[in-house]
């Protein structure tokens, strides 16, 4: 349920302690990506892409914490032997269980529309030197989000901007990569009740990773990724006297084996760890997650 560890805050001479504690559950995580290119002229094409993902805790009767995300793109792409560039307008919808709605009673049966958004993304991929398999990738994205609930919309409706730059190089059966990402959120309402809207933020982060094909182990594939980021909010945080500052760290490990594939489906073993340190006690997080999955390319 993405709740912070138990904490207490001193406010107006009184002590207030959290009542919502972390809850564990077994769930089903799913993801489906589709893409189709329709050639136009020479290197130009119309590109259609969809992404669908989410988590369901239905079988543990914890669907109040379900989430789902869908995005559909339709735009233009140009691709040649060294470079790919695309401009893709998109529309997205986010669904959530009742735990994300302040105005709803607890419901463990279904997720409901929570947030809608529309925007445009630009992606550029460039093969620096095909001979040594070095690739440079750059993306730029901007979208506007609209929340369903009035009170949440007051704080969180607005524009998201992000840019990402990465460099990857392959050394035989080894691939190393690293990247930098910048995000910001600019709320539509800069001030609320004569106070700076503290939902606005800037985030700087970078990641490093290692992909390995272990031929000596008969086809084992591994992927290790670590990321580090600092998020700085504007305005004064709730129950505080200064802006909120977060330090975010994460680590993920993914394993698969070619010989375990069955009819195109490859099982995967995944582990992820995320940790957030913050001067706001309610923003602290420490999450471990194990999952068994199956990847199917068709």
Each predicted region: which residue ranges?
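Outer-membrane beta-barrel channels and translocator barrels
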Residues: 37-44, 79-83, 125-131, 170-174, ...
